[in-house]
Amino acid sequence: MVNKNSPKTIDRIILGVDPGTNVMGYGLIAIKGTQLTLIQFGVIHLSKYTDHAIKLSKIFERISLLIEEYHPDEMAIEAPFFGSNVQSMLKLGRAQGVAIAAAISKQVPIFEYAPKKIKQSVTGSGNASKEQVAAMLSKILFFQEIPKLLDATDALGVAVCHYFQKGDVKKSKGGWNNFIKENPDKVKTVPAKISKKKTD
């Protein structure tokens, strides 16, 4: 597992966050040149807490712990989408705000991306499904088992989106087809399996 406390073998670490009030996803990737390496990804379970204030405190606590453990250089977070349920949107916005506050308290730069932008960056289509995003990420980051809760892969998608938006990889109008053609060593076909294991 990559760790910023180990000898300098990476350029930077990106923490991706998919905010939520019942399940919050997180994913960490390491960057070395143009090579992406998966560090860790998972979810923070919040549905067992009925008090919204407690949920927010748990989000702050867990994001802070992730930053302390992995020392990310940047945090990328998905922007809340606009829905018809005002109360749900308000709660989601609070969850995002608390995650951002945790990063600010640790002096980690924050970057925000819209859901469609993330899907476009990862798959080439802004209308891709969560399953399509997860499948593409499994090829980019070389993991075979896709977690049952796709909030984890959504968070990885935010981190990978940020990597591309920072200009680390030059992309032409060909999008992903062009990237795969120019970087065959970074993408290989790996059968993706849906894991039934409980995510911590």
UniProtKB/Swiss-Prot annotation:
Alphabetized InterPro entries for the sequence: RNaseH-like_sf, RNaseH_sf, X-over_junc_endoDNase_Mg_BS, X-over_junc_endoDNase_RuvC
Family indicated by similarity: Belongs to the RuvC family.
Protein name stated in the entry: Crossover junction endodeoxyribonuclease RuvC
Function, as annotated: The RuvA-RuvB-RuvC complex processes Holliday junction (HJ) DNA during genetic recombination and DNA repair. Endonuclease that resolves HJ intermediates. Cleaves cruciform DNA by making single-stranded nicks across the HJ at symmetrical positions within the homologous arms, yielding a 5'-phosphate and a 3'-hydroxyl group; requires a central core of homology in the junction. The consensus cleavage sequence is 5'-(A/T)TT(C/G)-3'. Cleavage occurs on the 3'-side of the TT dinucleotide at the point of strand exchange.
BP terms from Gene Ontology: DNA recombination; DNA repair
UniProt KW keywords: Cytoplasm, DNA damage, DNA recombination, DNA repair, DNA-binding, Endonuclease, Hydrolase, Magnesium, Metal-binding, Nuclease
Protein EC: 3.1.21.10
Named cofactor requirement(s): Mg(2+)
Organism from which the protein derives: Cytophaga hutchinsonii (strain ATCC 33406 / DSM 1761 / CIP 103989 / NBRC 15051 / NCIMB 9469 / D465)
